Amino acid sequence: MQRTFAARYPASDPLDLGEGTVVVLPSLSFPTAELRKIVGIGYYEERLLFLLLLLRRPAVKIVYLTSMPVEEAVVDYYLSFLPDPAGARSRLHMLAAGDPAPRSLTAKLLDRPELLDRVRELCDGPGGAFVQPFNVTAREQALAERLG
């Protein structure tokens, strides 16, 4: 995914794409001991939900990754700002690892090859795909490489 990104979006805002899939990775890759200290760590993964507004473009799809499912009412709130919330919902894929443990989402995903396979399937289509991480460490790079 990342290999062709720069060539496809050389002079524009990378989030102003006309078509394609954005894989949202709101992972905090810090040591587990540090993550345990953060009150409400589970909600930190929701801080990139503003990216759902990219669905205003009909040819954009989003795969949003989380440790645990995000409340539907929260997702609906963001989609309500779009001209076609139902159309946007059909192009939004919320995937949860189902793991509330205080460790990085990226680590959880790397431990779940079946979930990575599902992300890969969802990224197949026109316009290609790219990963939009919260922060980048060697783990996020490894995840992007495993996704292709």
Language-model-detected regions and their locations in the chain:
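ATP-binding N-terminal substructure of ATP-dependent carboxylate-amine bond-forming enzymes
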Residues: 1-148
